[in-house]
């Protein structure tokens, strides 16, 4: 719906599995547990990440409009989709928006064999002329969602994207994904 194939409807199966396993609580009510005029902490109570992320950025925007800056942190949430979506929310209000999150360990550090780091997306958006500035990136070569797309299409991964469980370059999407899930080693570069 937002034009990023790896983060759209393809995620619904994963979310459904997380709901069935009790990892996502569909009835969770995100709650502000700490607040100052310029900051807040929201406990998402393991709810849907997109709903919690939207609430957090909405609150950050309100605080920025009142105080000049708004910083909201979230805990106990789930996958929140596209980091850039939230940064653009602030930009549309004439503000500088910044959004980032952590993720499960899927990246193998340099000279490593085991996935120890998350893809940890980061995004920034700000009003500018003639076009707004927009940056949205992962700290890995590729997102897990993109690996899943290659796997679904039964296509080999491009060279330099992933490592097998022994730390060697791999183009085999099913093996790379299976090793990430099982934490056998390997992952994204």
Feature annotation, model-predicted:
Residues 1-3:
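Acidic/polar, glycine-rich intrinsically disordered N-terminal extensions of enzymes
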Residues 106-176:
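Phosphate/diphosphate-binding glycine-rich loops and adjacent basic-rich segments that engage nucleotide
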Residues 36-39, 66-70, 92-96, 118-121, ...:
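Short coil/turn connectors at secondary-structure junctions
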Residues 54-58, 62-102:
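A glycine-rich phosphate/pyrophosphate-binding beta-strand-loop-alpha-helix module
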Residues 42-44, 65, 70-76, 97-101, ...:
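General beta-strand structural signal in soluble alpha/beta enzymes
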Residues 8-61:
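Active-site cofactor/substrate anionic-group-binding motifs, chiefly glycine-
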Residues 180-189:
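Internal helical hairpin/lid segments
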Residues 50-54, 58, 77-84, 114, ...:
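Short, amphipathic alpha-helical segments
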